[in-house]
Swiss-Prot record:
The lineage of its organism: Eukaryota, Metazoa, Chordata, Craniata, Vertebrata. It catalyses: a monoamide of a dicarboxylate + H2O = a dicarboxylate + NH4(+); 2-oxoglutaramate + H2O = 2-oxoglutarate + NH4(+); 2-oxosuccinamate + H2O = oxaloacetate + NH4(+). It is found in: Cytoplasm. It holds the Pfam family CN_hydrolase. This is Omega-amidase NIT2. Keywords: Acetylation, Cytoplasm, Hydrolase, Phosphoprotein. Homodimer. The modification Phosphoserine is found at residue 26. It is an enzyme of class 3 (hydrolase). The gene is Nit2.
Length: 276
């Protein structure tokens, strides 16, 4: 199949985990009714974003949140990218995205590789590494439509990850992410367009809706960018479902017109992956 419908759920996240899960599943069902084949939730869809919240909201996989995601994926026969949740495993915490297939089975689990440790004086200081551990693996999954590569938020800043995914046959990269009011206006769309053009892939980002009262205010603006670098659709700041019909014929045409993937100079440079 050369076309499919992608849905990004820009969820308004509250401090009540059960409400977040229930609302997320409701919006997933709505997206499926509108013909979505692949649906993505945002980063930290079941909890507020913050190092003080991660230990409190963390759960094992499978657990409360992922069991519900499995059920709703199977109920609606869709591929569901479960945004991310704080995951507890063997005494460590991770920022983890679980993906479920139309049969409800877990396809892959991506743990955020690059932790969000930044300091922009006078604007924002954040250190995920205070409570989280980094993942150490690449994460892709196959659908009847295309191969999908996964990253979470800060992972998008690292071009090497996207390059490796493209080399491994991914045609769509999905980054559940929660950029903030400093980095969002500066880099959110820029990075998506860069990753799309550099690798001639579709790039999609699913953000939480903006909550001005939250301790961490998300930028919002979930987005889909095509391999030409064109923004196909972009949300505002409120809770919504963003739809985009992905055309893989267009991707093939762009790769034929500007064949950069075949023109790379492996005799001069390379991006090396140290793990499978």
């Amino acid at each position: 199949m050369s076309t499919f419908r992608l849905a990004l759920i820009q969820l308004q996240v509250s401090s009540i985990k059960s409400d977040n899960i229930t609302r997320a599943c409701s919006l997933v069902r709505e997206a499926a009714k509108q013909g979505a084949n692949i649906v993505s939730l945002p980063e930290c869809f079941n909890s507020p974003y913050g190092t003080n919240y991660f230990p409190e909201y963390a759960e094992k996989i499978p657990g409360e949140s992922t069991k519900k995601l499995s059920e709703v994926a199977k109920e609606n026969s869709i591929y569901l990218i479960g945004g991310s949740i704080p995951e507890e495993d063997d005494g460590k915490l991770y920022n983890t995205c679980a993906v479920f297939g139309p049969d409800g089975n877990l396809l892959v689990k991506h743990r955020k590789i690059h932790l969000f440790d930044i300091d922009v004086p006078g604007k924002i200081t954040f250190q995920e590494s205070k409570t989280l551990s980094p993942g150490d693996s690449f994460s892709t999954f196959d659908t009847p439509y295309c191969r999908v590569g996964l990253g979470i938020c800060y992972d998008m800043r690292f071009a090497e990850l996207a390059q490796i995914y493209a080399r491994r046959g991914c045609q769509l990269l999905v980054y559940p992410g929660a950029f903030n009011m400093t980095t969002g206006p500066a880099h959110w769309e820029l990075l998506q367009r860069a990753r799309a053009v550099d690798n001639q892939v579709y790039v999609a980002t699913a953000s939480p809706a903006r909550d001005e009262k939250a301790s961490y205010v998300a930028w919002g603006h979930s987005t889909v960018v095509d391999p030409w670098g064109q923004v196909l659709t972009k949300a505002g700041t409120e809770e919504t479902i963003l739809y985009s019909d992905i055309d893989l014929k267009k991707l093939s045409e762009i790769r034929q017109q500007i064949p950069i993937l075949k023109q790379k100079r492996a005799d001069l440079y390379s991006v090396e992956s140290k793990k499978p």
